[in-house]
Amino acid sequence: MTVWVGLTGGIGSGKSAAAQCFADLGVPRIDADAAAHSLTASDGIALPEIRRLFGDTVFDTQGLLRRDILRKEVFASPSRKALLESVMLPLIFSEIKKQQETFTDAAYGIVEIPLLTEKRQFISLIRRVLTISAPLEKRIGRVMARSGLTRGEVAAVISHQASESERLLLADDVLLNDGSLKSLREKTMRLHAFYSGIFASKPTQGKHNG
């Protein structure tokens, strides 16, 4: 039976880089954001309900979702954000569960769930939580470098996410990503050895019961 570790962290913490390090070691990897993207891609099963709730203005003339328009709309309105989440979260949950069922032989796998702290229903899918942490200034710098957003825009996104202290309270394990990619790989390798050991001998190890 494959046991699942939920990998989470704030924007710019290095979640995807850490998840890729695990994948490079042969660990099964599931990405909640990738699942969400597939659900809203061309012919994605979430599109009809999104169109019904948000109208044609969030779609282009080819019927493709205008993600930038939808993102601005939900970012500016908590009620619209909740409406979108009412559509997407159950579908993402089901997609992750479906993907998990395709893995049975590995000792453990990684599920990358950025909003795990905010959306606790996903905890039922995992056994243990790994939080990727990084100093705030490093996080802001990373996001600015890759996205072109201003410092103020990045800070606004961070302010809408769970706090670092909230993520740390949920965590079984914490990986501090405050250095180079080489350092991140080394820390990931140590965690891989740890997880491989505990899940081989004690598959229920952890405070979560997914």
UniProtKB/Swiss-Prot annotation:
Compartments where located: Cytoplasm
UniProt keyword annotations, A-Z: ATP-binding, Coenzyme A biosynthesis, Cytoplasm, Kinase, Nucleotide-binding, Transferase
Ranges annotated as spanning the membrane: none
EC number: 2.7.1.24
GO cellular component, one term: cytoplasm
Pfam families according to UniProt: CoaE (PF01121)
Positions with a binding annotation for ATP: 12-17
Domain DPCK, chain residue ranges per copy: 4-202
Catalytically driven reaction(s): 3'-dephospho-CoA + ATP = ADP + CoA + H(+)
Pathway the protein takes part in: Cofactor biosynthesis; coenzyme A biosynthesis; CoA from (R)-pantothenate: step 5/5
Single GO biological process annotation from the record: coenzyme A biosynthetic process
GO MF term (any one): dephospho-CoA kinase activity
Family (UniProt): Belongs to the CoaE family.
HAMAP family hit by this protein: Dephospho_CoA_kinase
Biological role stated in the UniProt entry: Catalyzes the phosphorylation of the 3'-hydroxyl group of dephosphocoenzyme A to form coenzyme A.
Protein name stated in the entry: Dephospho-CoA kinase
Species for this entry: Neisseria meningitidis serogroup A / serotype 4A (strain DSM 15465 / Z2491)
Organism lineage string: Bacteria, Pseudomonadati, Pseudomonadota, Betaproteobacteria, Neisseriales
